[in-house]
Structures are given as structure tokens and as C-alpha cells.
């Protein structure tokens, strides 16, 4: 029951962000300024170089994305997942509700549940969603951010990076005695960073 409940909650978390609007524009402006001051000599667009094709990082418009939402369950191979330490990947029907699509995986460790998600949620949606904690993070993946709802579930967090085909995210939920020992946001950031590194350096 715990695992299914977590997965469904993750689907709801991603979907409800699309209607959220709050007041964290300053956070996004600060991030934009930081990007503007980065080296102008860098011309290569950061991307995930999957066997199925290149997934470039960048902004997207969920209203015009249509059917081109990236599906991590079918467009990332079993071998590519395994290289990042992700096994047991299976489609999760609860996530296929139009706003997101994704899959559950084997637990990275006992009491820690992991989902891989393709979402129409943008960084702006996440930053403006009421009751959510949002933060850009330092990572090898340019523009990665985390968000969670401490009211609905303080032990679940999603790390996401926006791409030209929607958000690519990994959600982590912690249960049992590990709730007070593991930071789900740190784990989610590590998992998504590992996927990026393994794909691009493999």
C-alpha cells in the first residue's frame, strides 16, 4: 500500500503544480541573472544524449508541447538506466494522466521509493505553486531544481530539469525510520545527476 500511495501522490504533486501560482518570481529572476553572467563563450547546449535521441535542456511551453512530452520509460533504454544504477523500471499508469508520464523502479535502498517522471510542469510552475518549497540547486545538470510540499508529504521531493520536451524528473519518497535520517531532496538530486553523468560520460 505504501508504494502505490507514494506513486499516486507523486502524480498528484506533479499535476497540481500546473495550476499553482504564488509569489516566488524573485527566485526565478535571481536564477536568470546568474545564467546571464555565466560564460558567453559556451555555445554547446547542455543535453542528455540518449540512444533514442538528444534531449536538450531549456525552457518549454506546456501549452504547445502537445504529444511531444518526453517519456522516460520508453525513450531511456534499460541499459542506460542500469548505467545510472536504476533498475526494475516499469510504467506507472497512475502517472499517465496527461500532465505527466513516468515509471516506478526498484528501490535504491530499503524504505526509499524512486520514480522517474516526464512532466509538463515548468520551473515557473513549481516556483509559483502555493505551499511548495522550491529551490535551484548546485549540480552538474544546468538548471536543476527541487520542489516538495511539506504539508502534503514532507518526506517526498522531486528533482527536475527543464528540457525542450518537458521536465525530466526523479521523485524520491522516504518511509519508516529513515524519514528522519534521509533528505529526499538530496537523494533526488544525486539520482538525476547520476543519470546525466552516466548518459553523457558513458
Where do the PLM segments sit?
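Sequence contexts marking disulfide-bonded cysteines in secreted/extracellular proteins
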Residues: 22, 72-74, 102-104, 156-158, ...
Amino acid at each position: 500500500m505504501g508504494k502505490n500511495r507514494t506513486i499516486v501522490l507523486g502524480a498528484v504533486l506533479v499535476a497540481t503544480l500546473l495550476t499553482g501560482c504564488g509569489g516566488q518570481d524573485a527566485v526565478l529572476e535571481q536564477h536568470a541573472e546568474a545564467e546571464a553572467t555565466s560564460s558567453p563563450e559556451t555555445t554547446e547546449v547542455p543535453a542528455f544524449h540518449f540512444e533514442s535521441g538528444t534531449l536538450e535542456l531549456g525552457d518549454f511551453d506546456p501549452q504547445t508541447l502537445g504529444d511531444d512530452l518526453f517519456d522516460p520509460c520508453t525513450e531511456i533504454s534499460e541499459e542506460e538506466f542500469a548505467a545510472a544504477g536504476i533498475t526494475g523500471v516499469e510504467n506507472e499508469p497512475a502517472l499517465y494522466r496527461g500532465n505527466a508520464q513516468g515509471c516506478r523502479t526498484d528501490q535504491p535502498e530499503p524504505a526509499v521509493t524512486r520514480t522517474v517522471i516526464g512532466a509538463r510542469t515548468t520551473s515557473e510552475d513549481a516556483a509559483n505553486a502555493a505551499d511548495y518549497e522550491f529551490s535551484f540547486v548546485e549540480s552538474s545538470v544546468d538548471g536543476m531544481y527541487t520542489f516538495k510540499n511539506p504539508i502534503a508529504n514532507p518526506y517526498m521531493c522531486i528533482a527536475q530539469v527543464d528540457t525542450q520536451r518537458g521536465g525530466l524528473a526523479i521523485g524520491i519518497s522516504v518511509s519508516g525510520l529513515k524519514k528522519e535520517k534521509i533528505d529526499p531532496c538530496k537523494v533526488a538530486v544525486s539520482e538525476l545527476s547520476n543519470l546525466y553523468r552516466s548518459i553523457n560520460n558513458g
